[in-house]
Amino acid sequence: MKKLGLIILVLGSVLLIQANSSKYTEDSKLSETLFSLGFTKPNHFINYSTEQVEQGKELVYEGRTIGPDGKQSRFISKYYNCLSCHNTVKEDPNPAVSDPEARLDYAIQNDIPFLQATTFRGIVSRESFYNGDYEKKYGDLVEPARNNLREAIQLCAVQCAQGRKLESWELEAILAYFWTIDYTLAELNLSDDELFQLNYASERGRERQAIDLLRTKYLKASPATFVSAPQNLKKGYEAKGSSSRGKEIFERSCLHCHEPDGVSSASFHTDFSFDFLERTFYKNKSISFYSLIRNGTYAMPGHRPYMPNYSKERLSDKQVEDLRAYIELKAQS
């Protein structure tokens, strides 16, 4: 019995030492882990300074910053900043799956916006941008942006935000900030066993095995499927809406832009707004509420800011009906 107890004690000590000396922990960054395992660095990899990170964060949050000349830079856009459409935190409970229902639950639990565009969290570890049907909206402009994060950022600044092209130092500063908000291994939901496997494979020269494991834990591209408004506007989509979930969508998505002093000129914060919104469900198909959600709007002479559309991965048919159920409930009450 004494020998058995000694063996258990020794084994426990070995496991404890291994756990305490693990190269990769829950706090390890995804990209840094992959690179240390021999994964090829992407063309948007940079070595950056603390000053660049601060500049990049201000550009993302405020739209301008103090430039290399010590002066305040011009706004990238006079209509929007990056946070008008993007989060900077984890927004999917499982980063390997694009599920709008799960994302809404996660947004409610973590009190974050529910937006049209994918989060910047982990963007440096993605390999493709403006995916799927985005070419239907932006045409050939998406081609140089598909496999180039710098070009994707420029397209977003000039077209989506209806702003100006970024200067080189601004672009590199934004990239610097993006590298600091890559996923941690904890955010990829690695189990204790998988984290052990990762370290075990690394220590024994099985880097490819470790890389393959990590790359199953997140999407390398955000899918984007554009869908049409329902044929019968009065009937809507087949799914039955939930007004309680519609309330969450309205407050976390619609009011993100359409609140008082928001980025949109249209404000929907009063009870009278719901009467107006309810009527738009039955309007001409090209300008109905459904059409605005599924197609968005376009920049026009004299009115350049426009509303981005919601792909089915960002707002499901069911969630559109949830939103309708809430609007109708408020309009009728």
Label each residue range with its predicted role:
Residues 66-68, 89-96, 181-188, 333:
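Secretory-pathway/luminal and periplasmic proteins that interact with or process carbohydrate-rich
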